[in-house]
Amino acid sequence: MEFSVKSGSPEKQRSACIVVGVFEPRRLTSVAEQLDEISGGYLSNLLRRGDLEGKPGQMLLLHHVPNVLSERVLLVGCGKERELDERQYKQIISKTIKTLNETGSMEAVCFLSELHVKGRDTYWRVRQAVEATQDSLYTFLQLKTKKGEPRRPLRKMVFNVPTRRELTIGERAVEHGLAVSLGSKTTRDVANMPPNICNPMYLFEQAKALEAEYENLHVDSVNEKQMDALGMHSYLAVGRGSVNESIMTIMEHKGGPADQAPIVLVGKGLTFDSGGISIKPGEAMDEMKYDMGGAAGVLGAMHTISALNLPINVVGILAGCENMPDANAYRPGDILTTMSGQTVEVLNTDAEGRLVLCDALTYVERFDPELVIDVATLTGACVIALGHHATGVFSNHNPLAHELVNASEQSGDKAWRMPLWDEYQDQLESPFADMTNLGGRPAGSITAACFLSRFTRKYNWAHMDIAGTAWVGGKEKGSTGRPVPMLSQFLMNRAGIESED
């Protein structure tokens, strides 16, 4: 897919299709009015006849509009002008792209990027349009024998900006949007792979493939024998029931000075979670291939920052593991000694992600990090609390939490800060060990974060629970690519990347 920006009037555009908006009720945007004028009132006559009301997402594809150089004009309903917000804008762009792709318009000039969106500028509108386009066109066809692709798919999009002085901003937005989309696609491709293909070794191989592509990226791994020597017995216990070896992949992006403390991202990489001995119900268990969504998100974010070659140092950890029932599997009642030396009583083997992450979070102390962010499909409780719209953010450092929430607002990849109060720590008490791996039903996402917080006392840390946002079920089942946009924005902010650079 090719993207570009230009600044010009619609009547001078020669393309397969021009895309312009119509507000509700039946009111042409200023750009559409220019086309209406040169066509002798052709568009306004259609609206008077009631062919298009202008409701959000309505589409009307016109062929051979009088005096218009382009073959087609796509009228897009944008709703009420004063009510156009971020969510509606992205939905309109997505539906527009799907319509263009399905109707044989191989290229188009889109003027929707000139629409006024509350509190958003040209950079945001163009970048979100690029990301929404790539998201709308995403397919996972690698394992299908019949691909079912459109005969004449959309191949080129031009987004118009209001003035020539905004061309540089628009070009920057395209560059950033493409890099974020690249990372999101990597995340989705890896997460959508079935667990008989995507195992911990597969995660490592995908990281190595990126290493071959980018000069500043170095990839290494820690195998089970090395984990044992390091005392990572909690991590090892989770994978004991699987024939697939646990592998922790280490990705290092070295874009900053050698003495710059790195930002560390740690992704939970349970490539399949059966629940272990505390086995899950059969319904929707297939979706537990997405329990490596945290690792997939970190892999995608590392792809984005490598593509942008951000001038900072970032370490990405993919904590690969598989939780299966077996004669060798760990059991409820077991007491595990973690890499930190703290002991954990296992109450439920399906609360395994935190047992993998706690050792990974201890391991990363060796990098003397500026900060650490772990990303995990950790708890169903977070889905109950926040649904499928927002990622839960927990942190032991207020400025870091604010930075992450700010990045979520900038990127449109929504997040909400959750409490991490000492009162919740009491729910983890054990009569036999330093703590249990389960805090009971109340506040399940918070007690899981409290568990992790006991292994992060040596650095500033945030935990992102993406259980509700990493994938969707049902007819449109698949990975969402989140939280790559949010993580990428956070890292771009840290690198001092601005829209005008």
Swiss-Prot record:
The keyword Iron does not apply. Mn(2+) 1 binds at D273, D350, E352. Binds 2 manganese ions per subunit. HAMAP family: Cytosol_peptidase_M17. NCBIfam families: PRK00913.1-1, PRK00913.1-4. Gene3D superfamilies: Leucine Aminopeptidase, subunit E, domain 1, Zn peptidases. Keywords: Aminopeptidase, Cytoplasm, Hydrolase, Manganese, Metal-binding, Protease. Presumably involved in the processing and regular turnover of intracellular proteins. Catalyzes the removal of unsubstituted N-terminal amino acids from various peptides. PROSITE patterns: CYTOSOL_AP (PS00631). The lineage of its organism: Bacteria, Pseudomonadati, Pseudomonadota, Gammaproteobacteria, Alteromonadales. Mn(2+) 2 binds at K268, D273, D291, E352. InterPro entries: Leucine_aapep/pepB, Macro_dom-like, Peptidase_M17_C, Peptidase_M17_leu_NH2_pept, Peptidase_M17_N. It comes from the Bacteria. The active site is at K280, R354. Its cofactor is Mn(2+). The gene is pepA. Belongs to the peptidase M17 family. Its EC number is 3.4.11.1, 3.4.11.10. This is Probable cytosol aminopeptidase. It is found in: Cytoplasm. It catalyses: Release of an N-terminal amino acid, Xaa-|-Yaa-, in which Xaa is preferably Leu, but may be other amino acids including Pro although not Arg or Lys, and Yaa may be Pro. Amino acid amides and methyl esters are also readily hydrolyzed, but rates on arylamides are exceedingly low; Release of an N-terminal amino acid, preferentially leucine, but not glutamic or aspartic acids. The keyword Transcription does not apply. One of its GO terms (cellular component) is cytoplasm. Pfam families: Peptidase_M17, Peptidase_M17_N. GO terms for biological process: proteolysis. GO terms for molecular function: manganese ion binding; metalloaminopeptidase activity.
